[in-house]
Every structure is written in C-alpha cells, then in structure tokens.
Amino acid sequence: MTTRYARHPELRLTALDGEGVALHLGTRRYYSVSESGLDLLQALETPRTLDELVAVLMAKYDVTTELATSTTREFLDHGRRTGMLSVEEDA
C-alpha cells in the first residue's frame, strides 16, 4: 500500500521572506509555516509519498536522512490534524 499526501484543495499558500502563510478557505484558519514547511507545502501541490518529501528536504538542506524523515513525519502529522493535507492510499 502506498500513502500519498497532498495539499488540501482549499488551502492557499503565500511565501513571505522564506517562510509561509497558509489559509484554509474551508475553516478560515491561518497557519504560519517555517521555511522547510513551505518547501513541503509547495512540493505537495501534487501528491507525494513520505520518501519523496524527505528527498525534497535533503536536496535543499544539509541534514541527515533521520532528521529529514522525523521533520517530515511531524509536518505530515500536523497537516493531517489541522486539515491542511489530504491523504490518499492505493494498493
């Protein structure tokens, strides 16, 4: 089973000085996101797997696989809880 993550269709993203602001139109909530969070949200314009997202961070930042993976997992968990992300699973 492959799990893919994507930005919620009602999420709007704006980049400001290396960080971002996300607005969920459905809930009318704003979220501030870090530079790495902004990178992940931009990558999630199309559905991506955890491994693909880890690769996004590793390509830009000088981090270990373990740190990139834990950072990405935390981001995905938060994104699911807040409704910023949608999750697709296929066989």
For each predicted feature, which ranges?
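Long, charge-rich, low-complexity alpha-helical segments
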Residues: 29-91
